[in-house]
Amino acid sequence: MNPMIFTSLLATIMLGTSIVLTSSHWFLTWLGFEMNMMAIIPVLMKKYNPRSMEAATKYFLTQATASMILVLAIIINLMYSGQWTIMIMENPTASMLITIALVMKLGLAPFHFWVPEVTQGVSLSSGLILLTWQKIAPLSLLYQIFPSINTNLLLIMSLLSIMIGGWGGLNQTQLRKIMAYSSIAHMGWMIAIMIYNPNLSLLNLLIYIMMTSSMFMLLIINSTTSTSSLSRAWNINPIVVSTMMVILLSLGGLPPLTGFMPKWMIIQELTKNSSVMLPSLMAILALLNLFFYMRLTYSTALTMFPTMNNMKLTWQFQSTNIMPMMMSLISMSMLALPLAPSLITLN
């Protein structure tokens, strides 16, 4: 793809998200979503092959359906309230339809089926945009309308997402699908806490984007897309692969890594609101994610294939060429847990 065209598409994606973030009018919000969707489809098809075309088609159909539901909900809300303002949600049917539309855009269960397939069919760089930047606009709209949303519906969807995000990743060997199921589970955590503390949900989103971006950058450096290629990469660049394993454990929420911080704070906040069963179920279901992350780490780092001695010597003199900004991002993805006490105090 021409670099100028690619840059223009990325700028349009950012502009569409910015319109959604700053708008208080339903029409401008819908316009921002449409700009975002139409600009990212060529990005998903950057590597022009049948798999990327299929992935882009699935993404388009899902997002177009969600946009249709969103427009229907906006019209119903306009009929009852006579207002285009986002904060005014007087009709429960419109509120439920908007929730379903945003959940489809986010890829939460039971509307999650497109996320692993689309992520697997696109390149690593496109998958990075899909699983990080594309979550910002729907979550920001949920943040604005959460007082009018059916809380029971959101809690059921969040628990389903955490469970499916764990179960779905158990038998996966493709790293992009593993990251997709990880995204589904993390979205479940964000939606569950948004009802009680929306600001904590935004903090969780920030940490999730930081960890997922670090993981995808390291996958791009190593050009690894499956567990077998990850095992072979250990002989070539063990430092980078070791860092990837630590970030995977951080995504699973293993203390004392960064990923433990949002889960700890969410469970604490839910407990403060006299909810004991919900955080208990969430913590138990999160063990599924941690299990396949630890299994992947074990199979990659601790069970190496027999190799010749000269193969083991190659990585000792190889430079990694990692940018300082990227190193800072990776460090924060692994070592930000000491910030938790101050954040809890502020909260």
From Swiss-Prot:
Q: Which reaction does it catalyse?
A: a ubiquinone + NADH + 5 H(+)(in) = a ubiquinol + NAD(+) + 4 H(+)(out)
User: Which UniProt keywords are given for this protein, alphabetically ordered?
Assistant: Electron transport, Membrane, Mitochondrion, Mitochondrion inner membrane, NAD, Respiratory chain, Translocase, Transmembrane, Transmembrane helix, Transport, Ubiquinone
Which cellular component, as a GO term, is one annotated location?
mitochondrial inner membrane
Subcellular compartments: Mitochondrion inner membrane
Q: What GO biological process terms are annotated to this protein in UniProt?
A: mitochondrial electron transport, NADH to ubiquinone; mitochondrial respiratory chain complex I assembly
Summarizing the function annotation, the protein's role is:
Core subunit of the mitochondrial membrane respiratory chain NADH dehydrogenase (Complex I) which catalyzes electron transfer from NADH through the respiratory chain, using ubiquinone as an electron acceptor. Essential for the catalytic activity and assembly of complex I.
Give the highest taxon in the source lineage. Answer: Eukaryota
The protein in question is named NADH-ubiquinone oxidoreductase chain 2
Report the PANTHER family cross-referenced here. NADH-UBIQUINONE OXIDOREDUCTASE CHAIN 2
EC annotation from Swiss-Prot or TrEMBL = 7.1.1.2
Q: Name one GO molecular function term.
A: NADH dehydrogenase (ubiquinone) activity
Pfam entry (one): NADH_dehy_S2_C
Q: What class of enzyme is it?
A: translocase
Family stated for the protein in its record: Belongs to the complex I subunit 2 family.
Q: What organism does this protein naturally occur in?
A: Sylvisorex lunaris
Q: What is the lineage of its organism?
A: Eukaryota, Metazoa, Chordata, Craniata, Vertebrata
Could you describe the subunit structure of this protein? Core subunit of respiratory chain NADH dehydrogenase (Complex I) which is composed of 45 different subunits. Interacts with TMEM242.
Mode of membrane association = Multi-pass membrane protein
